[in-house]
Amino acid sequence: MGKKLIGLVKLALNAGKATPAPPVGPALGQYGANIVMFCKEYNARTANKVGLVIPVEISIYEDRSFCFILKTPPAAVLLKKAAQIQSGSGQPNTKKIGSISLQQLEEIAKTKLQDLNTQDVKKAMKIVKGTAKNMGIKIND
């Protein structure tokens, strides 16, 4: 029989920049997990993705050991990077603040595919397109 799971923690952290300070410290500290070891492992595994927010799902076991799974960056972060903007529009229906090409949309959809509830790239593109629309980003055909 495997180890008994005592906690599942989901965090969204900047790649390569996890520190024992909040939010990591309090989230893992309550389970007695080794915070410094997590930070070192996370930073090592995300070193090539600096500048992106990488969500992580941490499973903490009874013996205080842990394992974690890295997810893909949120669609909004990828869209902001592609459109070269700092934040979404306050009025996405009337004020467009950037645009991306159909190829960029497809690349983002392919990146997000493993975390979306579809295996079809066209459907994934529709999901990401909806996020872009809500951010005030125009898709150029």
Curated annotation (Swiss-Prot):
Keywords: Chloroplast, Plastid, Ribonucleoprotein, Ribosomal protein, RNA-binding, rRNA-binding. It comes from the Eukaryota. PROSITE patterns: RIBOSOMAL_L11. Its main location: plastid. InterPro entries: Ribosomal_uL11, Ribosomal_uL11_bac-typ, Ribosomal_uL11_C, Ribosomal_uL11_C_sf, Ribosomal_uL11_CS, Ribosomal_uL11_N, Ribosomal_uL11_N_sf. The keyword RNA-binding applies. Disulfide bonds: none annotated. SMART domains: RL11. Signal peptide: none annotated. GO terms for cellular component: chloroplast; cytosolic large ribosomal subunit. This is Large ribosomal subunit protein uL11c. It comes from Gracilaria tenuistipitata var. liui. The gene is rpl11.
